[in-house]
Amino acid sequence: LDTSAACHMPDVLEMPYTPPLRGAKALKRFALTADTESSSAHCCRLSSYTCLAGDIIGDYEFDHEINIGDRLVFEDMAIYSMVKNNTFNGIPLPDIAVMKPDGNCKVIRHFGYEDFKSRL
């Protein structure tokens, strides 16, 4: 994923909270284990690409296989995403986007290196 619970979704770690994910069912927090048997072969734990071992968003069940390049839409996540974000481990700040009623997204603010540098 190109997101991080630690950097972009702090409430996921602090509450803890498993955000709704469009097209998937959120499972009980940390329900998946190596021995988990499920009625679906499409269960997975979604996490970040930081080095933080606990940077886990949640366990989810999909009705189809997810693949690299698929768009995953976490819902109900604007709570603290803009005011408590950070750039831990070099993770970029999240873009600000608006989703139109037809499902198309438009990025209205992208943060780059200068934004990172100005926060130091």
What are the residue ranges of the model-derived segments?
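Charged (often Lys/Glu-rich) extended helix/loop segments that serve as interaction or gating elements
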Residues: 1-120
